[in-house]
Curated annotation (Swiss-Prot):
It holds the Pfam family ABC_tran. Residues 4-248 form the ABC transporter domain. It catalyses: phosphonate(out) + ATP + H2O = phosphonate(in) + ADP + phosphate + H(+). It is found in: Cell membrane. SMART domains: AAA (SM00382). This is Phosphonates import ATP-binding protein PhnC. Its EC number is 7.3.2.2. The complex is composed of two ATP-binding proteins (PhnC), two transmembrane proteins (PhnE) and a solute-binding protein (PhnD). The gene is phnC. It is a peripheral membrane protein. It comes from Staphylococcus aureus (strain NCTC 8325 / PS 47).
Amino acid sequence: MSQIEFKNVSKVYPNGHVGLKNINLNIEKGEFAVIVGLSGAGKSTLLRSVNRLHDITSGEIFIQGKSITKAHGKALLEMRRNIGMIFQHFNLVKRSSVLRNVLSGRVGYHPTWKMVLGLFPKEDKIKAMDALERVNILDKYNQRSDELSGGQQQRISIARALCQESEIILADEPVASLDPLTTKQVMDDLRKINQELGITILINLHFVDLAKEYGTRIIGLRDGEVVYDGPASEATDDVFSEIYGRTIKEDEKLGVN
C-alpha cells in the first residue's frame, strides 16, 4: 500500500484554468520526492491537494489506503494530523515564543478550548523540546519567533511538523526566500529526519541542483501534467529541459555547494 496515492486527479479553477490534469502517482513510505516545474506548472496545487488545502475537481487522493478526498469532520482532522506542512513564509505566530509555535503542532490532539488557553500537557512540551533539539535550535525555545533569522524560523516550522508526529511532511518551496548557506542547513535537516525517522517528504523546489542533490525521486510537472517521474540520479539536463519546456537557466540551477 502506498503512503500517498493520486488517482486520476484533476483540478480546474473557477476561471477555467486547468491546474492539474489526470495525475496518477504513488508515493511510498520513506521517499524524499521532489516536485519541480515552472511557476504555474501545478506544483503547489498538487502538494496542497494532499491535505486538502486545495480541493480537487475530480479523481481521488488516498493516504495509507484511506480516501482523504471523501473524508469529513473528525475523520478528516485525524488524517490531517498525520500530514505536517512547511510553508515558504514559515506560517508562524511571530509574537509567540518558539516553543509555543512548535506546540501548535499538537493542536489536532486536544480540545480547542485547551489550546486557546495554552493548556498543553507536560508530554507535549517534552515532544516540542525534543523536536527543537533535533533541528538544533533548542537554545532559542523561549525567544519570540520574529527575533530569529529566516533559516531559524523555517527550522521552527520543521520542529512543529515533528511535534505533530506526522508520518508525512509536505514542504512548499521551503527555501525559496533563504540564502545558500541557510538553504543547505534547512535541506540537511529535512534529509536527516527523512533518513533517521523514516518520514516521507514531498517537497516543491525551484532549483534543479537542490532537487538532484536531496531528492531520491523527481516528479516533473508541466502545465499540470506529469512529464517526468523517476530517480533523481537519472534526471539529466535534457530531462529538466523537457520538464521546463526550454533550456535551464543558470539561476534555476543554483545549488548549495
